[in-house]
């Protein structure tokens, strides 16, 4: 029975990714890139500035008597900053996809898959800009924080409440359940290989820690992410840079191999070119989530004076995830010279790093995947919770969702790798299609906001948005 279900999942996943998703994803990314006049390249400097030097947003700047995203604790005002929203999204992005996903793409699609991951990031960051800007535009005011995401711009922007519910359900299934089972599965495999710990035992520990964090709400999620994500990223990057530096003479050959394999310039690669493209884009999307509709859930929470600010920051997150972290994993695997067909997933990354730094490689990757994947579990959980609240904002509903997430974390620890990935691939495909339709239809609004932002910057102002600038939809913009 399980084998039959697994075969159905694999066949469905192959069909969606071979004939539908890749074409739609790339076409939309190119469309947004042209529509925004290459915003992801023109404003890289502004992205970095916004992240490193966030504006101090005052109530007057956003035209409110008080910031509705603020939380009064002991008389003090708190809010979710742009940086915290960035790292909550990055916590979800930087996870299994960066270590295990890259390895899977290379083992199945060859080194050329890395090139197509880069292509998706470079073009897809425009999609990330559009979706996160729209999420900021249509965000809502809660009792303790702003909230929003694709479900909200589908309902209030398109006037399609049913589409918002469909997206919310897919979001809950994809991030709360499917992705978290993959993250759990990868952690358990890594720790079994490194320390001999049984997956079921590790699953229990992982589930307990997940419950501890998620019952603390968005502010605990944001605090955890803003503490853990920068540290783990820096540590991993330092090791990766060290490995690449040690093998610097091999780097030109690796880059040539990636490009040759990407376009089938040699006989061996030519026969599997389609697989190379599919694996690169599939695993690239799993990792950077550009256009998938996930990061907007975090982007909507931030307190900013203009929607474009969070759109730019989330576009930077795509670059950080794929061009930096994923590339590091790819270079570690390819410069090591290990047989990429001998193992799969996280075990390939472990084998490559062990080859380079010795026996400490296995436990190092196990610890890093714990931090990467566990931070993703927490970020994924929050995305799902936002959409649970969209469907029915009740304490019971959120409580049941939290228990269901914990159950899927435990389930992921003991199911097969193929089953976990196939399930995630299908739900990811459906979710992405739903979101892309919405942001294509609403993209002109994001472009208008970008033009307004640029005009204010030219005038030497700190860009501030007011719904009076968009009178046709002003009644839909609750937070502005």
Regions found by a protein language model. Give the residues of each.
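Transmembrane helix-loop junctions in multi-pass membrane proteins
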Residues: 4-5, 35-40, 97-102, 176-187, ...
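Extracellular/periplasmic helix-exit of transmembrane alpha-helices
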Residues: 129-139, 143, 239-257, 265, ...
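Helix-loop-helix module between adjacent transmembrane segments
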Residues: 32-33, 120-144, 150-151, 155-185, ...
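Extracellular loop-to-transmembrane helix junctions
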Residues: 13-53, 105-144, 320-326, 362, ...
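Transmembrane alpha-helical segments of multi-pass small-molecule transport proteins
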Residues: 22-27, 164-172, 193-218, 235, ...
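Alpha-helical membrane segments and immediately flanking helix-loop junctions
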Residues: 61-106, 134-137, 143-151, 155, ...
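Membrane-interface loop-to-helix entry segments
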Residues: 24-31, 36-48, 185-191, 198-247, ...
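N-terminal alpha-helical transmembrane segments of multi-pass membrane transport
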Residues: 1-89, 96, 107-112, 441-480
């Amino acid at each position: 029975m399980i084998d039959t279900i697994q075969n159905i999942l694999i066949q469905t996943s192959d069909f969606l990714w071979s004939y539908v998703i890749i074409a739609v994803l790339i076409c939309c990314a190119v469309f947004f890139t042209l529509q925004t006049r290459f915003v992801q390249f023109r404003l890289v400097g502004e992205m970095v500035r916004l992240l490193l030097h966030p504006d101090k947003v005052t109530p007057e700047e956003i035209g409110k008597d008080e910031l509705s995203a603020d939380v009064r604790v002991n008389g003090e005002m708190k809010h979710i900053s742009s940086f915290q929203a960035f790292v909550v999204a990055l916590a979800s992005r930087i996870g299994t996809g960066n270590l295990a996903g890259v390895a899977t793409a290379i083992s199945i699609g060859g080194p050329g898959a890395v090139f197509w991951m880069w292509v998706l990031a470079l073009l897809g960051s425009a999609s990330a800009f559009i979706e996160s800007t729209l999420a900021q535009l249509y965000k809502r005011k809660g009792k303790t924080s702003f909230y929003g995401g694709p479900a909200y711009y589908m309902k209030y922007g398109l006037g399609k409440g049913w589409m918002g519910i469909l997206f919310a359900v897919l979001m809950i299934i994809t991030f709360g359940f499917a992705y978290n089972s993959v993250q759990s599965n990868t952690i358990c495999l890594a720790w079994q290989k490194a320390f001999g710990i049984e997956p079921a035992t590790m699953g229990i520990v992982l589930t307990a820690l997940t419950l501890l964090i998620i019952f603390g709400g968005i502010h605990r999620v944001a605090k955890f992410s803003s503490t853990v994500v920068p540290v783990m990223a820096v540590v991993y990057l330092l090791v990766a840079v060290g490995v690449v530096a040690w093998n610097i003479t091999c780097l030109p050959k690796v880059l040539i191999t990636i490009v040759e394999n990407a376009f089938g310039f040699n006989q061996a690669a030519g026969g599997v070119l389609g697989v190379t493209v599919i694996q690169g884009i599939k695993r690239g999307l799993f990792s950077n989530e550009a256009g998938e509709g996930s990061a907007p859930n975090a982007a909507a929470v931030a307190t900013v004076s203009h929607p474009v600010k969070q759109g730019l920051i989330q576009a930077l997150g795509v670059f950080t995830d794929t061009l930096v972290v994923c590339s590091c994993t790819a270079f570690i695997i390819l410069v090591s010279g290990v047989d990429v067909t001998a193992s799969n997933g996280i075990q390939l990354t472990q084998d490559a790093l062990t080859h380079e730094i010795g026996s400490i490689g296995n436990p190092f990757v196990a610890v890093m995947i714990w931090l990467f994947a566990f931070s993703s579990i927490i970020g994924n959980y929050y995305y799902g919770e936002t959409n649970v609240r969209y469907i029915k904002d009740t304490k019971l509903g959120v409580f049941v969702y939290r228990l269901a997430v914990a159950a899927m974390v435990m389930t992921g620890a003991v199911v097969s790798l193929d089953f976990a990935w196939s399930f995630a691939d299908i739900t990811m495909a459906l979710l992405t299609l739903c979101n892309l339709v919405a942001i294509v239809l609403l993209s002109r609004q994001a472009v208008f906001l970008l033009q307004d932002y640029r005009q204010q910057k030219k005038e030497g102002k700190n860009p501030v948005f007011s719904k009076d600038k968009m009178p046709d939809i002003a009644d839909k913009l609750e937070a502005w």
